[in-house]
Amino acid sequence: MKNEGNILPFARGTCVAPFGKGCADYVAGGGGSGEVTTDRVYNLIQGLSFAELQGEITYDHALADYYTEYVKRLYAKGMKPGLIPEAPFPSELAAKANTPGMVAVIVISRFSGEGWDRCCGSKLHSVLKNDILKQEEKIFPHGDFSLSDEERELVSQVTKQFSKVIVVLNVGGMVDTAWFSDNPHVQGALLVLQGGSMGGIAIADLLLGEENPSGRLVDTYARSLDDYPSTEGFHATSNSVAYTDDIFVGYRYFTTIPAQNKNVVYPFGYGLSYTTFGKKVLNAAFDGADISLTVQVTNTGKFRGKNVVEVYVTPPQGILRKAHVVLAAFGKTQTLAPDESVELTFRFPLARVASYDEKRAEWILEKGDYEIALGESCMDLQPIKLRVQLDDDAVVEQLKNHLVPSQLFQRLNADGTYEQCAVHAYEKDSCVLHRQSSSKLEGIVPEVVGQGYVDRTMESTWLSEGFQEVANGKQELESFIDSIDDDALIGMCGGQPNTGLANTYGFGNQKKYGIPNMMTCDGPAGVRILPDCGVTTTWFPCATLLASTWNEELLQEVGRVAASEVKENNFALWLAPAVNIHRSPLCGRNFEYYSEDPLLAGKLAASLIRGVQSNGVGACVKHFACNNKETNRKESDSIVSEQALREIYLRQFEIIIKESQPVAVMSSYNKINGIYAAENKELLTDILRGEWKFEGFVTSDWWNHAEHYLELKAGEDLKMGCGYPKRVKKALRKGAITMEDIKGNVRHLLQAMLRLD
C-alpha cells in the first residue's frame, strides 16, 4: 500500500524490531464456518525466526519474547486471536532496540466472524450483542475500523523513536488507513489480510523480497467509517436494512457522487509492486457487440513480478442510474523477469456494463459514447483510443420484474440527491400453517433415517441397487423417482445424520432405494472438521485475500487442491465459496466474501468452483442473497431496489451460475423485500432457474426461520440441518403443496448427486 524511498523489500542483513501484539497474535482467518482446525498457525515472529536462521535478517529477540509471552498469557485465559487488547508499550525494550539501521515493524490485527458484526463505536452500535461483540467493544470502544487508544500510543511511540517504520495490516476487512498514509514517519505498509496457517511465513517472505507483492485492492479504503454511505443506516434497526445507497456501492459511490473521491485513501484496484511495469495497447476494436483488446505488459524494473491489467468502462449518463466507471474485464500476467513482456488478450461484450431498467424490465445499453480505459486503479485511468458509440438505445435482454420492493423509502441518485420512493404495506403472509417459534427451529439434529456411515470410496456398496441403475443408465430418473414412496421423498428434502468426520450433516440417505447419505462440510477457508475428531486440514487464505490476487488461474488451483481434502475426508459437498458483496465495512463476515465488485467476485469464485468440481466433489455457493449483515441475520429484511439487486447483489451469482454451474446454491437467512430468501420463488425459481438456467439443487442455510413447505414450493430443494416432514405432510393435506412439487425437489437433488464421484 505504501513504499516510500523503496524501504521495501528489506536488504539482506536488515535488523528488525517487531512491535504490536499482532506480531505474535496472528489472525489466520475469521470465526464461524471460516475457521479451520489445522496443525499450526505461524505468526510474523516465527516467520522472522526462519529468515534469521537462513541468514537473511536479524530481529530483536527481547521485543519478540515480550509480545510472545503477552499473547500466550491471554490465550491461556481463553481469548481468541485478534480479540486481545494491545500490549502496554515496552519503553525500555524499545529504547534498547533503537540502534542505527533498525527497522520497526508494527503489526495491527483484527478478528471478526459469523453471527456478529464488527463493533463501530457507541454512536452506531447495535442493541443486539453477543459475548464476542461485547468483548470486542471493550478492546475497541471507538470501533475496530479505527485504531484503539493503545494502538495509537504504540504508533506514536514507535514513530518518535525509529526513523524507519513499516506497518503490517493483518485484518479481514476494511480498516482506517489514513493514519499511516498521511504520516511521513511511516514509510511502508503491507495489507496482508488473513493468510491462513502459513500467513506469518508469507509476510516475512514479502518483507524480505522472497516474493513480490502483486495483489490489488478489492475494496475502497476511505478516510472514515462515516464516509461509506452504508454506515448511517446499518444499525438503524435490527429488523431491517434499507439499501438506500442503491447501485452506488464501493467505488461506484466514491467515483460517482460529487466530491466523494476526496474521501478515498486507497482506491479499488490499487496495489504496488517492488518492480515497475509498462503497458501498451497493441489492438483495440469494437464490432458492435464485443470489445477486443490486446495489451502488452513489460516488466520495466529490477525484480521479477506479476502485474494486473484492469479494464474499465465509463458509460454515457442517460436516463437510468449509472456509476461513473465500472470494471469490465481484468487479467493477470505470469511472473515476468526484468525486461520480459507478455500479451494479454481480452474480449468482452459491451452488454457487461448494461443497466437494468425497472420500468421496462430489461437490460439496456443507453445511446452515447462508452469510454474504455486501462486502470492502475478505478481512479487512475488511461483512456484507450477506441470509438465505442451507440446511436440508439440497445435492449440486451427482456425480462420480467422480480423482487420489487415496497418498503424502500428512498434511493441515491448519481448527483448525490435522493429519490423519494412510494412505500406500501407488505402482502399478507401466505403460510397456511401457524409458523413455529424460532426457539423450535434452532439446532435440531436430524432424525436417523436410512443407512448409516458408508465409505464413499466403495462405490459397489453405496450404490448397490436402485439409484445405481439410474447412474448406470439402465433406468430413467423419472421412473425411479416415481418408484419412491411419499415418506422417503419428503424425508429426502431434509438434512440427514452426520457420519464419519462430518458435523454439518448430509443429504440423500435412503438405503431402500440405494441412495447414499452424502456428507457436507464447511467452509470457505478450507475443510472444517471439529477439533475433537483429531483430524487437521489446510487453512487457506481468507476469500478477500484470494480475491486480492485478481488471478483466476490461481483460484482454480486453490479450488482443485481444497477439493482434494474434501474428497479425502469422505465429503461430497463443500459449503463454499461465499460471495456476498462488501457493502459495508461493518459486516462481520466480509473476510469470507470476495469484494465490493460483483464482476471480480463472480469471475474469481467461478474459477474456484471449476477447480473444485474438476475433482468430482460439489461446490455450494452462498449466501443467496443480500446477506450483508450478521446482526439478527435470520430475521433481518434487506430492503433493496430491483436495479441494485440485479446489478450488484445478484450479479456475481449470475456469473457463477452461467460460467461454472455449481452443484448447489445456498439461500441466505435474511428476508429480501419482506420475504425470506428461502421462501422466495421469484429468487429461487424465476431468476435462478428460469433466467440463469441453474441445473443444481438449492439448500437452505442451517436452521433458518423459513417454513419448510414454502421453501420446497419456492424451489429450495433441501432444508438443513434437518427437515420438518410432519409439517410438510400437514401442508399437503391442506393442498398448499403437492407431491409433484416435492418430486421436482427430489429430482434436483438426485440429478446433482449423479454429478458427484
Which ranges hold each PLM region?
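Glycoside hydrolase catalytic-domain context in secreted enzymes
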Residues: 1-356, 362-380, 396-757
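Short beta-strand elements
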Residues: 381-397
